[in-house]
Structures are given as C-alpha cells and as structure tokens.
Amino acid sequence: MILCLDAGNSRLKCGLFDGSGWRMQGAVNYQAFDDLIGELPEKPTSILACNVAGEAVRLRIEALANRLAISLDWFISSATSCGVTNSYDAPEQLGADRWAALIGARTLHSGPSVVVMAGTATTIDILDGNGVFRGGLILPGLALMRTALAHNTADLPNATGQFRSQPTNTDDAIISGAIHATLGAIERLLATLGDDRLCLLSGGAAAELAPHLGVPHRLIDNLVLEGLARYSRACSSIAPH
C-alpha cells in the first residue's frame, strides 16, 4: 500500500494506492497536513512523494515517514520513464509535478495531448502520440494573476467576481481577464500544433477553466497522483533522493 503525495505550492494532495486502484484520495492546505494523514483508512507500507513546495514541506514529509516507520522515495524528473520521453534541454530541471502529470496523461490517454495543470502556476505541456514531451508554457495561475493586480496597483481589488464574456464591473473584469488570458494561451498553443489533440485539464483551478474552453478537453482529478501511481506500479527502481 503506497501513500502517494503531491506537495504543490498551495496544497498537499494524497492518495492511498494498493497497486491496482485508489483506496482514497484527498487534499488539504498545509496547516491541516496532520488531519489528512490521520484519516488514512490503513497504514501505508511506503511513501512516494513529489515535492515542489520547498524544504520545509520536504522535512515534514520526512518526519511523517519516520513517524510511520516506513520507507520514503522522492519522485524526480528523468530523461525517460513509463513510456514518456523528456525533451527538456536539461531533463532533470523539469518540475517533478509536470513530469508526473505527463506520465499520468500518457497513462490515461494514448494519443497526442496538451496537458494543462492549473494551480498556483499554470503549465501547458505538449505530449505527442509517441509519448514524447515536446515542451510547454508556464504562466501565473488564475489566483496569482488576481492577487498580482491587487498587490501592485493602487485601486484594483483582490477580485471576487464572476466570469463574464463582456464584464461591466471591475471584479468581473479581473476574473474574466485572468480566465481569458489562460484560455487564450491554451487555445493558441493548440492552434500552432495544427491538429485536434485532446486537452487534459487538472489542478485546483481546472474547473474554472473547463466550462469556457473552446477545444476538446477532459477534466481529470489529481493527474499528478495518477502519474505517481503509474510510476510506482510500472517502474521497478525508484531513485531515492
């Protein structure tokens, strides 16, 4: 029984994987870290963790493994894994969460795709039909766009409006602008590829984007966890780090 952990910038996502399916999945902010772990239906035999949240979170995960007296392996990017090839100039510099999401995407969809992870940052990654990662984009996430305007201007609020095609108030204009900007990046990248490949959407803000996206798409819960599960099942060696 493997406890898969996706330690993102804003939240910790976890899933208990038994080798064939999920026993549970959940997500919390880091203040409630111990509460989530306390809700596990049974003790895991090991932990596989993907961490992009920094050293403090890394230490908390290590402390958890020590408390449970189980092994801990860190998922890191590599040149190839689980049928996916990494074409980054320096493969090890690709974010581990992006790499896990690409593996998850390849597991769930065998054709070419664009993989969108909408979190604190939004990443838009190209995966071809042979499982080769061809590169991608990084832009501020929806919430980060909103707070950047609030923190760096004198008069704009930290908006709590709604998406509108033609906004007529400031809050709606900010919310709609952030969503339009992200949709535009996704749709423009797809247009440059010149085909009708599927867009796979995941992450905390994915549900805000999906209703307005004008290309074929599929909304997936916890794509990073899906990649970790695939890695744990299919790869015989996990490099400790």
Which residue ranges define each predicted feature?
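Small-residue (GG/TT-enriched) beta-loop-alpha framework at ligand/catalytic clefts
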Residues: 100-114, 134, 139-156
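Gly/Thr-rich phosphate-binding beta-strand-loop-beta motif of the actin/hexokinase/Hsp70
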Residues: 1-23, 105, 111-133, 149, ...
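Active-site rim beta-loop-alpha module in soluble metabolic enzymes
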Residues: 139-193
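Conserved phosphate-binding catalytic cores of ATP/NTP-utilizing and phosphoryl-transfer enzymes
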Residues: 83-113, 227-238
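N-terminal glycine/serine-rich phosphate-binding loop of ATP-dependent small-molecule kinases
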Residues: 1-81
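Conserved phosphate-binding/catalytic loops in two-lobed NTP-binding clefts
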Residues: 69-83, 214-229
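Glycine-rich phosphate-binding loops at beta-strand->alpha-helix junctions
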Residues: 11, 50-57, 176, 196-213
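Glycine-rich phosphate-binding/hydrolytic loop that grips phosphoryl groups
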Residues: 154, 179, 217-241
